[in-house]
Each structure stands twice: as C-alpha cells, then as structure tokens.
Regions:
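Conserved beta-strand hairpin/beta-sheet module of binuclear metal-dependent hydrolase folds
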Residues: 3-7, 14-89, 93
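A short, local hydrophobic-aromatic micro-motif
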Residues: 9, 99-102
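Short, glycine/acidic-enriched loop or turn micro-motifs at the edges of active sites
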Residues: 66, 111, 126
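Metallo-beta-lactamase
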Residues: 101-112
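Metal-dependent catalytic neighborhoods of phosphoester/phosphodiester hydrolases
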Residues: 115-119
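Conserved small/polar residues in nucleotide/adenosyl-binding loops
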Residues: 120-126
Length: 130
C-alpha cells in the first residue's frame, strides 16, 4: 500500500496472549468465545504488528511490539513467543533490516506496543531517533 510518498508494510513482531475477560470487557465469554478460543488460563492468542513507512529518505517504524528480553515469569504470564514472528524476520521478508530504521514512533506506552524500544534485538543506528 502507498500513502503519499510512503510505502506501507505490516511488520509482525510477536505472538502473545492476554486474558479474554480483559480484552472483551463486559461482553460475556459465551458470546466472544464463539469467535475466539481461549487457552486453559483464559488467554486469547494475539499477534503484535508494527507499521513500517518507507520513503527515499526515511524508514519509520510505528511501534515495536513486545521485544525479546523478558524474564521467564512474564514470558509465561503473557505467553510471549517470537519464534514465528519477530522484527528482524518480518523486516527481512520485505528486504529491510532494523539497522535501516531512521525513526520510531511510539503510539502509547503499552508493553505490546513499545516493549522492544528499550531492551530487545531491535538496534537503531546512531542517527535513529524515537
């Protein structure tokens, strides 16, 4: 997809699970579980996705996903898995690498959106900015 001078790419960064009750709020489980199944801990499986905007001058990553450096306790609680999806693999499928990212835009401070900003394999070049 292209918007203005930017080509847009969907970048899958990880899989994880969140409590179905927290995700669906006041919607009763018998209603939402018709479409989404939960595991034995009532977590629903989700995929984190970032958006990459590419122009001749910039490669802008919007959000970074969960990241990879989680204590085992939190990996287990949130069922974080980067085996199938991670930033490097997803950027690579489009011919890019994290070293080419010039800017990162953080939409908000939830771990599944900015977890890779401060401690992960995502490496920004010295001219990259958040």
């Amino acid at each position: 997809m292209k918007i203005g001078k930017y080509d847009l790419y969907s970048v899958e960064t990880s899989e994880f699970g969140l409590d179905g009750g927290a995700m669906f709020g006041i919607i009763p489980k018998p209603v939402w579980e018709k479409k989404v199944s939960a595991d034995e801990l009532n977590r629903v499986n989700m995929v984190t996705r970032s958006l990459l905007l590419v122009s001749d001058e910039k490669k802008i990553l919007i959000d970074t996903g969960n990241g990879t450096k989680w204590e085992e306790k939190y990996k287990k609680i949130y069922d974080i898995n980067t085996d199938q999806y991670n930033i490097e693999k997803s950027l690579g499928k489009y011919g890019f690498s994290s070293e080419q990212i010039t800017d990162v835009i953080c939409t908000h401070m939830h771990f599944d959106h900015i977890g890779a900003v401060s401690y992960t394999h995502l490496t920004l070049p010295t001219n990259g900015r958040v």
